[in-house]
Regions:
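Flexible "cap/lid" loop of the alpha/beta hydrolase fold
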Residues: 91-95, 102-135
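Active-site loop/oxyanion-hole signature of alpha/beta-hydrolase fold enzymes
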Residues: 28, 32, 41-81, 248-251
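Catalytic active-site module of serine/aspartate enzymes centered on a nucleophile-bearing elbow/loop
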Residues: 226-257
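Conserved serine/cysteine hydrolase catalytic core
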Residues: 167-222, 227-230
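Conserved HGGG/HGGXW glycine-rich cap/lid loop of the alpha/beta-hydrolase fold
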Residues: 4-52
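Alpha/beta-hydrolase fold catalytic core
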Residues: 1-15, 35-38, 71, 75-76, ...
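Conserved alpha/beta-hydrolase catalytic His-Asp/Glu region
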Residues: 133-187
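Gly/Ala-rich beta-loop-alpha elbow adjacent to hydrolase catalytic centers
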Residues: 82, 86, 90
Length: 257
């Protein structure tokens, strides 16, 4: 699949993969700052943003999409960065095609299996319940979402997925049906018979429970050269909670290591 992507800067290639319900827009600020030293590519994953929709929605399929982006742009020795769902895809790609990836950075996700989180399922169902017919203002949509999604930040993340149609109403950029039907897959473990022995950095938010100390064994089994850093005051959305600290860690890992 040909993914929509944004590109900034020149130099060694860096690809940033967003998480579930996200899009390339969410990483533009950090991407532009990284582009002072690197050529940064930020795609919209399948079923997100401006990329095509498809019923198939798995880590392997998404990894193949990113591989196609790498090959189409004649990239090599890529630094691959992924947050949450994007981190799982980045891990899968590094394990499947380690010759294409020079180093890997995974933000607030482990390779292990997670129980399906009620909050994620609730978000999809809340979006599916929204009536977009005749709604011409974002407030009209937020007024419907607020009853199911009380957290302001989550609502704002979701609202970024709206776009105006030709008749001045709204539609979702997300493929809600595909996400809903494949939700279990998005919490599966990353599976591979191989390992990725190049430098890997896992970054976790200290206020998040997505990576805990018990995950270390799973991480090192697949990524024997992995290290872990914690940003104490950050939650799961590390790039929103601690952009300055995250950017410093990124640059240190990519430039100094």
């Amino acid at each position: 699949m040909k993914l929509f992507f944004r590109q900034f800067g020149l130099g060694k290639p860096v690809i940033i993969l967003h998480g579930l319900f996200g899009m390339s827009d969410n990483w533009v600020s950090i991407g532009k700052q990284l582009s002072e030293h690197f050529a940064v590519y930020i795609p919209d994953m399948r079923n997100h943003g401006q990329s095509p929709h498809d019923d198939v929605f798995s880590f392997s399929a998404m990894a193949d999409d990113v591989l196609e982006l790498i090959d189409d742009n004649y990239l090599g020795n890529v630094t691959l960065i992924g947050h949450s769902m994007g981190g799982k895809v980045a891990m899968q790609l590094a394990l499947n095609h380690g010759d294409k990836v020079g180093r890997l950075m995974v933000i607030d996700i482990s390779p292990g299996k997670y129980p399906v989180r009620h909050s994620q399922q609730q978000v999809v169902e809340a979006m599916q319940r929204v009536s977009l017919t005749g709604i011409t203002s974002r407030k009209g949509i937020e007024d419907q979402l607020i009853y199911s999604i009380s957290d302001f930040r989550t609502r704002q993340l979701i609202m970024k997925n709206l776009f105006r149609t030709g008749n001045n109403t709204f539609a979702w950029r997300l493929n809600l049906e595909a996400i809903h039907h494949n939700m279990d897959r998005l919490f599966d473990s990353v599976e591979s018979d191989s390992t990725f022995g190049k430098p890997v950095l896992f970054i976790r938010g200290g206020q998040s429970d997505y990576i805990n100390n018990d995950d270390r064994e799973k991480i090192l089994k697949l990524f024997p050269d992995a290290t872990l850093e914690t940003i104490p005051h950050a939650g799961h959305w590390v790039h929103a909670d601690a952009p300055v600290e995250l950017l410093k860690i990124m640059n240190d890992f990519m430039i100094l290591k």
